[in-house]
């Protein structure tokens, strides 16, 4: 890691494979991927299921955990390639939002979009269509610009996480594979196109 400049916003460089932060660390800064790619890993079901996503520049990192009741990172982040990170202190973020209405509006729009995910997801989880559960999980736990989304799993743990019997889960995965929405090798699900999964399985009126 290399600290390039000491100013209200800091630029840091990470080499491929370096840890940027770990799940559970305090969100002391608003961070952005400004060059390269970073890989986020979210541990689920006691760590037996791992959701992996690639964050590609330019993108913001978990700003909805900067303030509020939970101010720790929900995932671990490592540099997937040589990666540039810009970080701003919380105090500086507040000062920007107080002085710049466009920045304030952008932040409110981002937070509102993420808050509305919960409403959509809860309604879908209550529906009788169990095929939506995988889409809901991906929808909730990944960013709308995330790429190379993968889920590493053991069958019993993924069944538990989705609340499905083994036969129902295998049928779901087989159906999604047939439609080209996921690729599966028995221990890892690959989701080539997040938008396709969300558009097909999480939409009003389905």
Annotate the PLM regions.
Residues 80, 98-163:
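Polybasic "coupling" helices that flank or enter modular domains
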Residues 1-16, 60-61, 65-69:
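Cyclic nucleotide-binding regulatory module and flanking cytosolic helices
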Residues 28-41, 57-58:
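Glycine- and acidic-residue-biased ligand/ion/polar-headgroup-sensing regions
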């Amino acid at each position: 890691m290399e600290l390039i400049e000491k100013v209200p916003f800091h630029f840091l460089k990470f080499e491929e494979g370096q840890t940027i932060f770990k799940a559970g660390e305090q969100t002391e800064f608003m961070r952005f991927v400004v060059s390269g790619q970073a890989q986020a890993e979210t541990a689920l079901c006691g760590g037996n299921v791992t959701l992996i996503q690639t964050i590609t520049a330019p993108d913001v990192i978990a700003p909805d955990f900067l303030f509020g009741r939970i101010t720790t990172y929900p995932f671990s982040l490592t540099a997937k390639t040589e990666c540039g990170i810009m970080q701003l202190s919380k105090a500086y973020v507040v000062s920007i939002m107080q002085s710049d209405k466009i920045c304030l509006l952008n932040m409110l729009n981002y937070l509102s979009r993420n808050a509305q995910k919960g409403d959509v997801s809860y309604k879908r989880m209550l529906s009788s269509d169990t095929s939506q559960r995988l889409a809901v999980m991906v929808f909730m736990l990944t960013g709308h610009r995330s790429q190379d989304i993968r889920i590493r799993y053991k069958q019993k743990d993924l069944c538990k996480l989705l609340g499905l019997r083994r036969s129902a889960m295998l049928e779901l995965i087989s159906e999604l594979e047939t439609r080209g929405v996921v690729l599966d090798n028995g221990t890892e699900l690959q989701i080539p196109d997040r938008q396709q999964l969300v558009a097909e399985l999480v939409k009003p009126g389905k």
